[in-house]
Amino acid sequence: VHLTAEEKNAITSLWGKVAIEQTGGEALGRLLIVYPWTSRFFDHFGDLSNAKAVMGNPKVLAHGAKVLVAFGDAIKNLDNLKGTFAKLSELHCDKLHVDPENFKLLGNIIVICLAEHFGKEFTIDTQVAWQKLVAGVANALAHKYH
């Protein structure tokens, strides 16, 4: 994905303010609630039977934080997303068999969570930059599927 210097700045400046655990847990929780078929990849997480159970599930919150830590790795390597996510792509493709469309869904939810948390600070230009980033990450994660 090609990001301009301004877009890279928009991403990195906002990233420094993101509450990783809260935002990651919220994003993964929303994915599981809005797209319930995605929960099949998380059967070992325990109770995911309703929104309250999902959003209060410590394993969901912990894995969501882990996802955002991986986004932090992406932000440190904006010019090499495929290399950054090569091992995760292989894991999700070969071992977990995750539908790569799910990466796009989660990326869009992350953008929604950021917009909600940052309000007016999450400008149109910031949203454009983040949409490009999450699309690039989704593409990098889907790389081993091609």
UniProtKB/Swiss-Prot annotation:
Binding site for heme b: H63, H92
Similarity comment text for this entry: Belongs to the globin family.
Entries under CDD domains matching the protein: Hb-beta-like
UniProt modified residues of type N6-acetyllysine: K59, K82, K144
Record's subunit section: Heterotetramer of two alpha chains and two beta chains.
Modified residues (N-acetylvaline): V1
Modification S-nitrosocysteine occurs at: C93
Chain positions with Phosphothreonine modification: T12
Source species: Osphranter rufus (Red kangaroo)
Gene Ontology MF, one: organic acid binding
Function: Involved in oxygen transport from the lung to the various peripheral tissues.
BP-aspect Gene Ontology terms: hydrogen peroxide catabolic process
Record's keyword annotation contains Iron: yes
SUPFAM superfamilies xref list: Globin-like
Keyword tags: Acetylation, Heme, Iron, Metal-binding, Oxygen transport, Phosphoprotein, S-nitrosylation, Transport
Matching Gene3D superfamilies: Globins
Name under which the protein is recorded: Hemoglobin subunit beta
Annotated tissue distribution: Red blood cells.
SS bonds (residue pairs): none
Residue ranges occupied by any Globin domain in the UniProt entry: 2-146
Gene Ontology, cellular component aspect: blood microparticle; haptoglobin-hemoglobin complex; hemoglobin complex
